Amino acid sequence: DNLVWIDHHVCSVQLVEQHLELVSVKGVLDMRYSAAALVYTWFHKGAARIPYWIQLVSDYDTWAKQLVDTDAFNYGMLASDWSVESDLWESLTDDVTMNIVRKGESVLEYIKQRSKSHLKSYGFVTEFAGYKCLAVNSRYESSMIFDSVRNQYPVCVMFEFTGRCWKYSLYT
């Protein structure tokens, strides 16, 4: 009775399908929403709406990307103190959320400009598996480096040498 299982991963849904005795465990399994959204709705039954910041977290975590502010909020949070000890968690009103979005928009603009410069300096057109592609020697952690040229190439390749091995990421 003291256990509440809240999850949004496909493997958990499959586990319940394979072990029907788990159906009786109190909680919610729903792949459409993030665990943050599921936890909020579980503990705030009857709430008129889910706070916007939780909607943004859910949109990002489930890769839905339906909300216009999702990426900006993510990068704004990355540029903030979001540690467990941070006071931020006590003050996430819609106004604070929008301030974080504005901060993230600045971060995204910086990334956009840096990506263009990096592609110009370290990118080159080549062929991969019969496809014309853009390759770039980069340690970037995101496919966003290719955003300015995404529609020009069917395949983009990011690669780097770590000193021990080559790492490759393919984007289509």
Task: Identify the role of each PLM range.
Residues V96-G130:
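Oxyanion-binding "anion nests"
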Residues A79-V96:
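Active-site acidic/histidine proton-transfer and metal-coordination neighborhood
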